[in-house]
């Protein structure tokens, strides 16, 4: 398809030990494999990204194939952007990000990428990528139109080898994308990007997001009940395809706070498991009528799925009395996923720095209900 002669493969460690990985190597042939990297540290530390960019450039790769989750996808996005812009240091990356924010011209990434996701984080469908400074613990995210994948291959069988908690937790991360996507607070900012995707602004965007959310809620529960259910896995993948529409419509503090939890050892999905319910409660309690209507749509979507409603009812919740915090929290607990910061040994003395980092994150700044550092601290303390 790309006429590639030198393919660079970036794979998760779990996938690299499977027959599928051996089959890929065999299909490409040794002569066409420029290099292989197995594993990227969670939340894509700058050091991993710079090393990856250096390796890809040194091998003169003309195609990159990824097999894995968000950390791998993000690292490749940034690495292929850093190569033409000669970025190899954190100050250089921060300068590049600043130029992108200022809408200044930067050299686009040009190496084509094929993403084969094995989780449900949805990064493979977006042009956003982030990396973490391990010294400061701060994660920075950027967006550029040249960071989209050229091809995304959805293979439900391949995802069966994904660790159970990673699969389920990244599913909650995608739920986070959809629920916060209903906020509608950033739709006006992404008009050009929606047009580029062919996702014109329309009155049906809430219906699209709610439909994808409902499908994901049901299919994710099905995969928990039957780990080898390939049809449910495919439906989960197909639902996650709508993540860009959600992200271009709304986003908020669950993402902003979650970005900063990563450097403390909390996985992508687990950040949403812990923080999303508390952010939703804050937004409901302090939001205006429009915010509550949109959050109400999320509640209706949970209760509108038969399998999900049965699961929620089994916990003692009723549609009449439960708020969105109750509903989302009960769903996450039904998946057997962590709900507190204490489960990751995060201490009280770390919360101040976490709140400061979260307030620097764009997603926190645009939360549909204004947040202060003290309010973020309240959310973090509730989540302990």
From Swiss-Prot:
| Cofactor(s) this protein cannot do without | Fe cation
| Disulfide-bond pairs as recorded | none
Pathway where this protein functions: Mycotoxin biosynthesis
Q: Name one GO molecular function term.
A: alcohol dehydrogenase (NAD+) activity
Q: What is its EC number?
A: 1.14.11.-
* CC annotations in GO: mitochondrion
By its UniProt entry, which Pfam families does this protein fall under?
A: ADH_Fe_C (PF25137), Fe-ADH (PF00465)
Alphabetically ordered keywords of this record: Iron, NAD, Oxidoreductase
In terms of InterPro entries, this protein maps to: ADH_Fe/GldA, ADH_Fe_C, Alcohol_dehydrogenase_Fe
Superkingdom is: Eukaryota
Q: Does the keyword Transmembrane helix apply?
A: no
Keyword Aminoacyl-tRNA synthetase listed: no
Please tell me what else the database record remarks about this protein: Gene clusters encoding host-selective toxins (HSTs) are localized on conditionally dispensable chromosomes (CDCs), also called supernumerary chromosomes, where they are present in multiple copies. The CDCs are not essential for saprophytic growth but controls host-selective pathogenicity.
In which family does this protein belong, per the annotation?
Belongs to the iron-containing alcohol dehydrogenase family.
Purpose: Dehydrogenase; part of the gene cluster that mediates the biosynthesis of the host-selective toxins (HSTs) AAL-toxins, sphinganine-analog mycotoxins responsible for Alternaria stem canker on tomato by the tomato pathotype. ALT1 also selectively transfers methyl groups at the first and the third cycle of chain elongation for AAL toxin.
Q: What is the protein name given in its UniProt record?
A: Dehydrogenase ALT3
Q: What species was this sequence derived from?
A: Alternaria alternata (Alternaria rot fungus)
Lineage of the species this protein comes from: Eukaryota, Fungi, Dikarya, Ascomycota, Pezizomycotina
State the gene name recorded for this protein: ALT3
